[in-house]
């Protein structure tokens, strides 16, 4: 009996060649296609996998789970890698790999396989998830396999092999970029973008309009949260209302994209040590992250917020590096969920030509006291108390300066 392998399959050149290669090595290949919001023809991908040699094909719609259990979870900690990247690709990978493991267990497969390269982050994200969820599964990673690397030294070898084996391929020179698309974002890498000094042409961007070409009228959205989770979006101009998590997120993508929101061009540090340039479009999540952070401003205790903010970079790093299923992630999420218990309320944001600006916020758990904050009303705050407060905090500064002067004599 042939040994079974579940292959994470996209329908592209690499994974199609890998599928056929695995078949020729004697494996019973089960292809698994994850729908996380990319604009693909999934029926065509399924047909291609079967024609290429897969014994069975799973096409899994993971979009809702992606929003509720992954994007919204990352939002709890305001996850941003290196202070800028909203982690659209990194957040999707553990979900894709988790479902792959579940299918392998259901099918009694001994192996899982993926088509991630040996230079990138995705190989780590996939394989750490496999290890965390089922250590008994064996991993086939062709782009780290000496036999595969000897046979396929580049894209030309892949194309020649595909043609020889009758694998349908689409080789286009129209978009010379490596792109990853899901519900949260689309990323653009490689090609001319590998030169960090190169200014991208407008045709790089496929989701968002240029901010300068966005509408001349602002869009006002009211975004409602419960315990830090988005539960409703209302367009205050046309009355559109969304409460279903998937529809809510798709609507934010739509509004953000047409208003030029969410573009990012950065050089980031990959986990394996290589620097990489990425151009990202993340419209909906950008709106959510800004609105969520604003609501925290009136609902979170100062010290809790500051402590969470200290942990947020580590949270983002764990996601980026592939440690979604890890003890340290469980620890952080428990703390973040506790910190979000009163992050309930609504924020109004003005969206205009690439900008997202909070203009109003309300929460039944607001810690903002208008009388205490007022410049005109004393509100029970004794201003003379500030004198002692300042003296206490100034004490160590005075001592430091006196000692410093003493050393200088």
Curated annotation (Swiss-Prot):
Write down the PANTHER family for this protein, in alphabetical order: ARGININOSUCCINATE SYNTHASE (PTHR11587:SF2)
The record's annotation in HAMAP family points to: Arg_succ_synth_type1
From which domain of life does this come?
Bacteria
Amino-acid biosynthesis among the record's keywords? yes
Residues that, per the record, bind L-citrulline: 85, 121, 125, 178, 187, 268, 280
Output the Gene Ontology terms for molecular function.
argininosuccinate synthase activity; ATP binding
- Say where the protein is mainly found: cytoplasm
EC number(s) per UniProt?
6.3.4.5
- Keyword terms, alphabetized: Amino-acid biosynthesis, Arginine biosynthesis, ATP-binding, Cytoplasm, Ligase, Nucleotide-binding
What's any GO biological process attached to this entry? Answer: L-arginine biosynthetic process
Quaternary structure per UniProt? Homotetramer.
Task: List the catalytic activities from the record.
Answer: L-citrulline + L-aspartate + ATP = 2-(N(omega)-L-arginino)succinate + AMP + diphosphate + H(+)
Subcellular location(s) per record: Cytoplasm
User: Where does the chain bind L-aspartate?
Assistant: 117, 121-122
Query: What protein is this chain from?
Result: Argininosuccinate synthase
For this record, an example GO cellular component is: cytoplasm
